[in-house]
């Protein structure tokens, strides 16, 4: 079988915990299809002797929540071998988002992460309100990396509690019940 690409003689660190080993890696399309020795021919062959080959890295703590709406590459993470990013960390994010809370959510993100609010304001289209609508907006854009997300509790509190949530007031029992709806195992079922 002829592959699109073979990377020959690299030291493979496969993430399973086994010792690194020297092998060839064959790629067809955008998939690794074989790892071993003497894999045959390919349209392109790269010699990787002295180099390490590893699966893509998963960055479990990012704040790409806004950038994900305009940057297909998730730069600079994708430039450094990251193939999956997780967002919604530290309780900050941009959904659910009532229209009158956009600036507050941007300020919250700006305070947690050194991301200029002006970049977020100019970059985001805000073509969503609910968390499912946010996910739909993200799915419309092709990506260089996979994305996963937490439902950010700061956005949920502000959405459910309005000014009281933004002011960090204690939630009522009713507020907690409403917040739980937005953090259910299937937030796609909760649309305002």
Q: How would you name each of these model-derived features?
A:
Residues 182-192:
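Single conserved hydrophobic/aromatic residue that forms the stacking wall/gate
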Residues 17-18, 58, 69, 161:
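Short capping/connector residues at structural and topological boundaries
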Residues 16, 36, 66-68, 86, ...:
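Activation segment
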Residues 70-180:
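Divalent-metal coordination cores built from histidine and acidic residues
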Residues 2-8, 12-56:
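Histidine-rich, glycine-flanked metal-binding segment
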Residues 54-74:
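Di-metal (Zn2+ and/or Mg2+/Mn2+) metal-binding site signature of metallo-dependent hydrolases
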Residues 45, 65, 96-97:
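Short Asp/Glu-rich motifs
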């Amino acid at each position: 079988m002829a592959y699109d690409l073979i990377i020959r003689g690299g030291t493979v660190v496969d993430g399973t915990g086994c010792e690194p080993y020297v092998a060839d890696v064959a790629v067809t399309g955008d998939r690794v299809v074989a790892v071993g020795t003497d894999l045959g021919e390919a349209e392109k062959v790269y010699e990787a002797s002295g180099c390490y080959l590893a699966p893509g890295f998963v960055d479990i703590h990012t704040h790409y929540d806004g950038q994900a709406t305009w940057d297909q590459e998730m730069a600079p993470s994708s430039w450094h071998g990251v193939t999956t990013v997780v967002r919604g960390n530290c309780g900050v994010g941009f959904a659910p988002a009532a229209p009158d809370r956009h600036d507050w959510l941007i300020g919250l993100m700006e305070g947690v992460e050194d991301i200029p609010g002006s970049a977020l304001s100019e970059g985001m289209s805000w073509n969503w309100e609910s968390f499912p609508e946010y996910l739909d907006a993200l799915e419309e854009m092709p990506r260089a990396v996979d994305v996963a997300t937490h439902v950010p509790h700061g956005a949920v509190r502000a959405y459910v509690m309005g000014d009281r949530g933004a002011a960090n007031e204690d939630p009522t029992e009713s507020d907690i019940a409403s917040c739980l709806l937005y953090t259910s195992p299937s937030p796609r079922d909760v649309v305002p």
